[in-house]
């Protein structure tokens, strides 16, 4: 939680829900006929708010007061101070659960998954996460190489996570790749895959947890190199084809258990 108390002060400014991610959530939830959703590690509640606007009742669980204090209120959202590993909710308190780029921050993700299963029973679980096997192919690591170690040490492999969810739930588990739009509005780590200039913006970097864990010297050197490569045209020479693409598979995945 200390990490998100540190980076969370301006989190809501850059980490806004993206409609394409939200619509994919709606599509996945539609088959479950759930009406009450628990959003675990809800942050500032951007996706809780998105679902509430579409008629869902949402229980948003978030341990960081810094995050909760930035949340936009909604009559269909109930905010709860709590940790994923010990959810302050009764058995079958919700019919489905979402975990949006939060699982890798849980102290004990396996205990958290057991708690999720307790709270939703046989209901649907949707995890939005990242495939750590993809990180070495992302050009951003050429400027900030510590991203590789951070991602590989914090994200769980997709196959392992899928197998663990299946073992806990007994439900079918589907992995759905999410191709990140070039104009993503939720500024998580891959927001600038086709817009490298975004990473020069301190506000963007401040909303990305991986940057908070990188040494300041590496960040300064990486930003300087990226700025120089953009000014000289070197970045466009090597990666400029990305600017022409509307979507790109950087490695983000929805894991759906139903």
Please provide the spans of the model-predicted regions.
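Class I SAM-dependent methyltransferase SAM/SAH-binding core
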Residues: 38, 44-86
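A short glycine-rich, Lys/Arg-flanked "PGG" loop and its adjoining helix->strand segment in the class I
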Residues: 110-123
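Short catalytic micro-motifs in class I SAM-dependent methyltransferases
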Residues: 101-102
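Conserved Class I S-adenosyl-L-methionine
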Residues: 174-258
């Amino acid at each position: 939680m200390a990490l998100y108390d540190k980076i969370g002060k301006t989190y809501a400014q850059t980490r806004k829900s993206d409609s394409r991610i939200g619509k994919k959530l709606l599509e996945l939830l539609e088959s479950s006929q759930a009406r009450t959703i628990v959003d675990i590690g809800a942050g500032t509640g951007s996706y809780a708010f998105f679902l509430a606007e579409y008629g869902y009742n949402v229980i948003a669980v978030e341990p960081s007061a810094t995050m909760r204090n930035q949340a936009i209120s909604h009559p269909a959202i109930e905010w709860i101070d709590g940790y994923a590993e010990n959810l302050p909710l009764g058995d079958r308190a919700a019919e489905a659960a979402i975990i949006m780029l939060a699982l890798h921050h849980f102290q004990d993700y396996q205990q958290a998954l057991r708690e999720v299963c307790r709270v939703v029973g046989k209901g649907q679980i949707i995890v939005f996460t990242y495939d750590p096997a993809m990180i070495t192919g992302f050009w951003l690591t050429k400027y900030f190489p510590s991203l590789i170690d951070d991602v590989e040490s914090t994200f769980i492999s997709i196959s392992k996570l899928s197998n663990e969810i299946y073992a806990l739930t007994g439900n079918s588990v589907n992995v759905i790749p999410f191709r990140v739009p070039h104009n993503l509005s939720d500024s998580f780590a891959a927001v600038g895959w086709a817009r490298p200039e975004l990473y020069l913006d301190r506000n963007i970097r401040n909303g990305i947890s991986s940057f908070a864990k990188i040494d300041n010297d590496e960040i300064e050197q990486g930003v300087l190199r990226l700025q120089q490569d953009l000014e000289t045209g070197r970045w466009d020479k090597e990666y400029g084809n990305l600017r022409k693409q509307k979507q790109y598979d950087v490695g983000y995945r929805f894991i759906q258990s139903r």
